[in-house]
Structures are given as C-alpha cells and as structure tokens.
Amino acid sequence: MNTYGWDIVYGCSKRVVNKHLKEYITKNNIQFLYSNIDKKQEIKMVFDNWEIINGGSSNFLRIKTPIKEGYFKVRNTTVDLSGINPVLEIKLDFFNDISNPNIKELKFNFGSESNDDIKIIVSDLNGNLQEEDEFYFNKLLINAFIQNEKQISYIFASLNVTSDIEWMNPKQFKFVYYSPTDNSDGYLFILSVVTNRDISKLSANVDGNILGNNSEVGLLISEKLFLQNMVLSRLSSNMGSNINKNNFEVISTSDTTGRIVNNSTLNWYGLKVAALYYYPKINNFSMQLFEGNKLKISLRGLVRLTGLEAVYSDFEIQSINKFVYNSTNKKAYFEVDKNPTSSYKYHLFPGDLISLAVLSSVTHWSIKSIEGALGFELINNFVDLINNTIKWNNLKISQVTNVTLNVGFCIQGNAN
C-alpha cells in the first residue's frame, strides 16, 4: 500500500460517518433561519438527516441536506421548501479544540463571508423546486448556512498532536475525501507527516485498500516509521542479552523508506559445542522490505575457535522472512525462513584435521542459531496504535479486524 510520501494516513468509511452524522442531526433538531429585511427576503429550513454521498474531492464533502419543512420568502411571494433535497459541497477544515489547542478538530467550515467554502451542486435532487425559484433559493440557502454555522458543531475527527506515542504525533496534516471510481462507499482520510518538512508537493492521492470491506477505520504507517518504531525494538528479541535495539539504526532512503543496519559489532550469545562455548560475531547486517510483505536480511560474520583465535570461519547468510498476522490470537510476526542461503570459508593451519572438524561443527551451529533467530514477533499494541492519535466521530476502536504489511503497515478495525 502506498502512502504517497506521507508518514501516516488515517481513514474512515463514509458509511460510519453517515451513521453518526444522522444521529447528530436528529438529536439536535437542526434548523436554519436567515432574513434580509432590506431586501424583504427570508428562509427557514428544518433539516432531515444529512448524508455524505460520493463526488466530493480534496477537502470538500458532497452532502445531501434534505429539508423536512421550510419556506423562503422574496418580497410578497412564499415558496414551500418541504421535501426539497439540496446537494451541497461543503469544505472541512481543522480547528483548535476550545479547551485543548493540541487537539485539532475536523469540522465543517462554511462560516466565511465568501461563497468559496460551500457550493450548490443540485438545488433539489427530487426535482420539486421550480426553475424560476432556484435563483433566489440558492442565494438564500448559502447565506443561511453562513449565518448559522455555529449551529453545526459536528466533529468528524479529533487529532491529538501531543499523544503518548510520540513517534505518531503529526506535525503537519490535511484532510481529503476519496471517492472510488466504482461508486462504492467513499472514505474520509487524514494525511500526516511527523516531521517538519515541506508537504506542498505531496500528492493528495490515497490508497483505498487502507480500509477493508469489513472495517470501519484504517491506519497506514510508512515503511520507514514501521522499521524505526515497530521492527527495530523487536528485531533483537531472539539474539541474546548482548544485542539490543541500540546496536541498530535506520538509514533513510527517502522521507518514507529506509533500511536497518548495524552500527556496531553484534556479539552473539555463546553456543555450546561439545564441552566448550563459542561466540559468533556479526560485523555487517542489513535488513530491508522485500516484495512488500517480507524482510530481506543479509549479514556477514565470523566465529573463532575458543583458545585458537587464529582458527576461524567467515560466514554469510541471506534470509527472507515473511510477515504473518494470526487473526485468532491477534499476533503479528515475521516467520523464520525455512530455506535461507548461507556460505562460509574456513581459516586454519594446513593439515589441521582436528581443528577442521571442530570448526566445521561450530560454523554449522552458528549459522543455524542465527538463521533461527531472524524471525520475531511484533508487540501486540494494534488497538492502542489505531486509537492513539485520532478519534473518528468520537469513536473508540475496540476490535482489530486485520493487520497487513504491503510496503506500508496497515491496521484495520471496528468500534463496538
């Protein structure tokens, strides 16, 4: 999955938003009144349930705003608006939460005195409004929205820019609406970067695969953030106490991609062969994503015979470790490669057959030990990750439905 240069992409299904938007409109009995005394014009609208429909783009949502009952007056003429169903495009924007400026709320933004933030797409989807009435209705409708903006305080999403998981905290972000070409449900997306870098040239494209058919929300993390914050901390979990995450670092290959290398010699734990312990060392280690859902690990090292430091073998290993998510126990891991490739070269005194036999055995078990440790499990905090920075429609996600790795790392989930 593609982040298109963004660090983290958050997505929510249109059908989920519509459910909660409907509840909001019903509960709050939304109605607008606007009048212009000088022009002897007035409009009143009591709204039925609003519904987001496909067709929105960038930071505009396309919405059906059916009028349950209402009217507009122009001079001495009154036009009944009951059953009229306007289709509008309304801009969404981020605003600071009143009590906590570190919470950015995604809300309607149609309070501008200009008409740029709200557009009428269809005056009446039901076709009941007379053509000669549309001109006045359209002008009054927009003015009514502008004057009554404070009545609509619905929050589509709350973004926490100072969350407990610091590496996820967005520094810059924007909202986009994604409308699939096959006319299936659209999605609301928030695109974010976690560093202060220029985003003016980043694409507003999104990957619709972030949300599955059975998921309400999705979270897509870039390759580099995944390696830095989810792989690096677990990579050494099977390598013994002498090796930890501080022995590795992520080398950037772009703003959103990278690879893991060692920054110091990796001192493997002691391997007992016969009566003695031997201690392999890895001098060169490289790990990168491969074919989207695998880790390709290449390393070179050596192991010396204890007491005979001049007798040693160089070895190389290449391992392909596939990502697996177990939906039953909710665990994600990189499995051990069943067919890794390896090579080695012995360094010993000519004719020393005893050392050769020992070195052969020590090299074999060193390689097997390292190959078996290159599979590891990720920390199972997927619910925390998907809830950490964002709340869609004030929902808390309690169920992870799927976790995938396909260049980007994706978590999908549902609320209760």
Curated annotation (Swiss-Prot):
The keyword DNA damage belongs to this UniProt entry's keyword annotation: no
InterPro entries per the UniProt record, alphabetical: Clostridium_P47
Induction: The toxin locus has divergently transcribed operons maximally expressed during early stationary phase. This is part of the p47-ntnh-botA operon. The crude toxin extract was isolated from cells that had been growing statically for 96 hours (at protein level).
Entries under Pfam families matching the protein: Clostridium_P47
Highest taxon of the lineage: Bacteria
The entry's keywords: Virulence
Oligomer and partners: Part of a crude toxin extract that includes BoNTA2/NTNH, P47, OrfX2 and OrfX3; OrfX1 was not detected.
Main function: Part of a botulinum neurotoxin type A2 (BoNT) locus; may be part of a progenitor toxin complex required to protect BoNT during its passage through the host gastrointestinal tract.
Family of the protein in this entry: Belongs to the TULIP P47 family.
Domain text: An elongated protein with a middle beta-sheet wrapped around a long alpha-helix. Structurally similar to tubular lipid-binding (TULIP) superfamily proteins. The N-terminal domain (residues 35-175) folds very similarly to OrfX2 (residues 6-168), another protein of the same locus. This structure is very similar to OrfX3 in the OrfX1-OrfX3 complex from P.bifermentans (AC A0A5P3XKL3, PDB:8BGM).
Protein name: Protein P47
Protein's gene: p47
